[in-house]
C-alpha cells in the first residue's frame, strides 16, 4: 500500500486514526502494531513472517546482549550481538543479493547456475538496519533492552517509516513508545507535514519523472547532448522530491500518532561540497553507516591511510546497500573518491573560491552521481554518459530538446525554488507578521489545497510507487 494512493488516504488512514484515538492509551501500541501488519500484508502477506521473525530475533538477542542484566555470563552479550548481526546481514544477503552473486559467478566462471528469482521483501533494508542498531546499542550500553515484546514489535513494524525510512533508531523513540505527544497541535503539525510530502511526491516528483522517463526511453536519433543532461537533471529533481516527500509523509504520520522522528533531509541541493551534500541527504542512512561501520572500523583514529580505507569501505557498502547491481556500487565508489579528495586537498581549495562556484561544483558532481544511479543497465548508462559529454555523435541541441525545455520550463523553475530554503523563509515571515491569519487560515487552506490537487493527480494516474521502495 502506498501513502500516495486513494486507498491509503481515504480508507486505511482514517480507519487507523479513528481506531487509535477511541481506544484506551494502554492499547494504542497494539492498534498500531496490528494495522502496521495489515499495511505490510497489503502488498506482501508472505513476508510478514520474515519481519516478525526479525523482531523475535531482535527481542531475544536484545535481552541477552544487555550487559546490565544481573548474573550475566561474560560472553553472552557479545554472542547475542554477533547473532543479531549474522541474522540481519544474512537476510539481506540472501533475499537482496543471491541472484546478483549467481549472475556474477556465471559471468566470471562461465557457469550456468539458475537464479532463484527471489522477490525482495519490501522494507527489508530499513527494518534490518533498525533491529540491528537496536541490538548493537543495547550491547554498547547506550539503551536498555525492551522487555515488552509488543513495544519492540511496534517500533519495528510502525507503518509510517516501515517501507522506505527514515531509519528510525530505537534510542530515539524508546521513551515515545511509552508516552508521546498526542495533542491537537501535534496532530495538526502532522497533517501539515504529510500534505507537504504528498504534494512533493504526486505533484512535483511524478511530473518531472515523466520527463526523465520520456528522455531515457527515447530513440538515440531523438536525443541531443542537452537532452541527455536534461534527462539526468530531471531525475535529480525526481529522486529528491520523491524520497524527501516520502520522508515528510512518514514524519507527518508519526506526528499524527504522537511520535517525533528525526529529519532525513536538509535542502541537499544548496550544498557547497559533496561532504556538505552527504550531511544533508538521507541523513538517517549516513549517520547509521558512520556510527555502526565507519567508527567501529577506526574512523579517523588510526592514521590517514586507514581513514581513507575506512571511507572507501563505507561508501562501497552504501552503494551496495542500495541495490544488487554494479551501477550502485560504482555510484558508492564515485562518491567515496570525491569525499576522499575533499578530505585530503580539495576541501581547502573549495573554501577559497566564491560560494556561487562552490554550489556549481557540488551540483555538477551530484547530477553526475545521479546519472550513475539512475541506469541499472550498464549499456544504457555508458551510452548516456557518452551522450552527455559529446561522444555519442549527437547534436548539441535539437528541436525535440527545445520542445521538452519549453514544456517543462515552469515546472523546472518551481522545482529549483522548492529545492531551496526560500519557501520556508517566506512561511516563517508570514507567521511572524500575521500569526493568527497564517495559523488559522492560510496554513490549513494551503494543506487542503495540496491534498485536493494531489488527489486530483492521483485520480488521473496509475500506480506510482516511491523510488526508494526498491531498496
Where are these regions (language model features)?
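Membrane-embedded transmembrane alpha-helical bundles that form the catalytic cores
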Residues: 1-470
Amino acid at each position: 500500500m502506498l501513502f500516495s494512493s486513494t486507498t491509503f488516504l481515504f480508507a486505511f488512514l482514517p480507519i487507523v486514526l479513528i481506531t487509535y484515538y477511541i481506544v484506551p492509551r494502554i492499547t494504542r501500541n497494539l492498534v498500531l502494531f496490528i494495522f502496521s501488519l495489515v499495511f505490510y500484508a497489503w502488498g506482501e502477506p508472505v513476508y510478514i513472517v520474515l519481519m516478525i521473525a526479525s523482531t523475535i530475533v531482535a527481542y531475544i538477542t536484545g535481552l541477552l546482549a544487555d550487559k546490565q542484566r544481573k548474573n550475566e555470563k561474560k560472553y553472552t552479550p557479545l554472542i547475542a550481538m554477533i547473532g543479531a548481526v549474522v541474522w540481519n546481514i544474512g537476510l539481506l544477503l540472501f533475499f537482496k543479493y543471491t541472484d546478483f552473486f549467481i549472475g556474477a559467478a556465471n559471468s566470471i566462471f562461465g557457469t550456468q547456475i539458475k537464479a532463484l528469482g527471489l522477490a525482495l521483501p519490501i522494507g527489508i533494508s530499513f527494518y534490518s538496519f533498525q533491529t540491528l542498531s537496536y541490538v548493537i546499542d543495547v550491547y554498547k550500553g547506550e539503551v536498555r533492552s525492551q522487555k515488552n515484546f509488543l513495544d519492540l514489535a511496534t517500533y519495528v513494524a510502525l507503518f509510517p517509516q516501515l517501507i522506505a525510512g527514515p531509519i528510525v533508531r530505537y534510542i530515539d523513540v524508546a521513551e515515545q513508545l511509552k508516552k508521546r505527544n498526542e495533542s491537537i497541535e501535534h496532530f495538526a503539525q502532522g497533517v501539515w507535514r504529510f500534505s507537504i510530502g504528498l504534494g512533493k511526491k504526486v505533484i512535483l516528483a511524478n511530473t518531472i519523472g515523466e520527463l526523465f522517463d520520456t528522455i531515457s526511453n527515447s530513440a538515440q536519433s531523438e536525443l541531443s547532448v542537452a537532452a541527455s543532461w536534461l534527462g539526468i537533471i530531471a531525475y535529480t529533481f525526481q529522486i529528491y522530491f520523491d524520497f524527501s516527500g516520502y520522508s515528510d509523509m512518514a514524519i507527518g504520520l508519526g506526528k499524527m500518532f504522537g511520535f517525533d522522528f528525526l529529519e532525513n533531509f536538509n535542502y541537499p541541493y544548496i550544498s557547497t561540497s559533496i561532504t556538505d551534500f552527504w550531511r544533508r541527504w538521507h541523513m538517517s542512512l549516513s549517520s547509521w553507516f558512520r556510527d555502526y561501520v565507519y567508527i567501529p572500523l577506526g574512523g579517523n583514529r588510526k592514521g590517514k591511510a586507514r581513514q581513507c580505507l575506512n571511507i572507501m569501505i563505507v561508501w562501497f557498502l552504501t552503494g551496495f546497500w542500495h541495490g544488487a547491481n554494479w551501477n550502485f556500487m560504482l555510484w558508492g565508489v564515485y562518491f567515496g573518491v570525491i569525499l576522499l579528495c575533499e578530505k585530503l586537498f580539495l576541501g581547502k581549495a573549495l573554501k577559497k573560491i566564491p560560494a556561487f562556484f562552490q554550489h556549481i561544483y557540488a551540483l555538477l558532481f551530484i547530477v553526475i552521481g545521479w546519472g550513475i544511479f539512475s541506469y541499472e543497465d550498464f549499456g544504457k548508462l555508458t551510452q548516456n554518459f557518452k551522450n552527455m559529454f559529446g561522444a555519442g555523435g549527437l547534436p548539441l541541441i535539437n528541436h525535440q530538446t527545445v520542445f521538452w525545455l519549453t514544456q517543462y520550463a515552469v515546472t523546472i523553475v518551481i522545482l529549483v525554488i522548492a529545492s531551496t530554503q526560500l519557501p520556508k523563509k517566506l512561511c516563517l515571515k508570514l507567521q511572524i507578521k500575521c500569526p493568527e491569519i497564517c495559523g488559522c487560515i492560510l496554513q490549513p487552506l494551503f494543506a487542503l489545497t495540496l491534498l485536493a490537487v494531489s488527489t486530483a493527480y492521483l485520480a488521473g494516474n496509475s500506480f506510482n510507487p516511491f523510488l526508494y521502495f526498491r531498496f
